[in-house]
Swiss-Prot record:
PANTHER family: UPF0283 MEMBRANE PROTEIN YCJF. Belongs to the UPF0283 family. HAMAP family: UPF0283. It comes from the Bacteria. This is UPF0283 membrane protein PM0909. It is found in: Cell inner membrane. One of its GO terms (cellular component) is plasma membrane.
Amino acid sequence: MNEKRLFTEAQTENEAVDFTPKREFHGEMHIEKDEPVIEDRFVEQTFEHIVQPRSRWWKTGLALTALLFCFAVIAQSIQWLVDTWQQNQWIYFVFSLVTCLVVLLGVSSLGKEWLRLVKLKKRLSLQQKSQQILRESAVNLGQDFCAEKHQQIKALCTEMAQMLKLSSEDPGLIQWQNQLHDAYSAQEVAHLFSQTVLHPFDVQIKKLISKSALEAAVIVAVSPLAVIDMFFLSWRNIRLVNQIAQIYGIELGYWSRLRLLKMVLLNLAFAGATEVVQDIGLDWLSQDLTAKLSARAAQGIGVGLLTARLGIKAMEFCRPLAFQAGEKPRLNHIQQELLGQLRSTFFRSNKTKVKQQV
């Protein structure tokens, strides 16, 4: 049996009782939606590892071997030209002259391709350097450190303006220089440069992306042949990337164009469907496309959005300064334009068919 316990009045008064405070509930409660958590850091690190692999010794050796081979071919061509001239072998001299010219043209074209590829790599490294400066200045807020980062980002923005081939009398550049202040942080300097200098380029490219997406959507929705759609979209997408690079002052060659397309397509593959869901939202569920538009129109909308995503990714890589928070273009406005354009196109075609039948 349990033993008897005696309680005194002093013990009960000294014991502290832990009561739960009352909670009041109202009829209306605000529930915040949980944002989807995406492993952006892991995706970004993996993507950068693929796009910019570590330099290997065999690549350096292969480049040196190719360089020595080019010099050997040039030297042999010149030697052949001199020998045929000295020996009065005019037929061989003509052949050697043509060969020498072809070799020189080939080497010069390879040199131009290499320079364009170097400029593209320099543009990407400049963008990454600006990202690093902005990231470091956001973490460390010391006065001396902020002043140092202010000068660094200012020098980078000036170099970006030179890459864009802007003159010293450009209105946007002059406005940016006049609005600068020593008290501004690196983020404020970069944001000011983006809004004054890069804003006209961004607006032009956004219009180009919207136009290309609308054209691709209408062509796919109207065209009956899938083969024609495939070749048309391939040509249009490559042309879109070239136009975006040209607007941002990047001169693309063969290898630099391949490298840029590789980076854009890899980024599209790594981003996946989660980014599309974030950009578009759940508007698709409320619009009931299957009840209003045909399957072909839905295919056109999908192709148009993919074209827009391709243009936005190319814009991210070609833009000298990386997008900050809230500056990156989204697919919402392009989605609305696609829906309106396709709806008007299909409804117009249906009305004409009804009139013809009547």
